[in-house]
Amino acid sequence: MTLPIHDRGFTQEEINFGLEKFVEGLNEQQAEHFKTKFPTLSPEHIVVSNRGRVYWKLIRERISDGGHCSVYAFVRKADGAILKAASWKAPALNAARGFVTDSDYGLCNAGVYGIRYLI
């Protein structure tokens, strides 16, 4: 199953900028969540892995927890589609949860525990 690429008229630079803003917003969400709910723990950080040819993998990591890592989401490089993680290596291809080129950089579809489910 493949999810069609949506040509929304954005350049690669605009998609890259949207990705930076998306990750920045996610890290702000994480910091605020840990500050209010878990003040004694160090917050998790979202980092981008550039290894994939098709997707950026967003990894949630907490250094103080022995380097615990999990996949937060995937973002498709071609159009900035935000995809929920199906596994460590692959995104769920049933539907895009938003785009990093949206006006809110796709943050309305992101929570502190991961990308929102489809409704």
Question: What function would you assign to each model-found segment?
Answer:
Residues R76, V112-Y113:
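Domain-scale terminal segments
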Residues T2-F17, S87-L93, V100, L118-I119:
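Long, terminal "pre-/pro-" and other extracytoplasmic accessory regions
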Residues S42-F74:
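Exposed beta-strand-loop-beta-strand "reactive/processing" segments of non-cytosolic proteins
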Residues E14, V48, I63-G66, N94, ...:
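Compositionally biased, low-complexity repeat tracts
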Residues P4-L41:
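Short, non-transmembrane alpha-helical segments in secretory-pathway proteins
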Residues I59-S64, A78, A86, L118:
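Small/flexible residues
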Residues D79-C108:
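A short, surface-exposed interaction/processing loop segment used at functional sites
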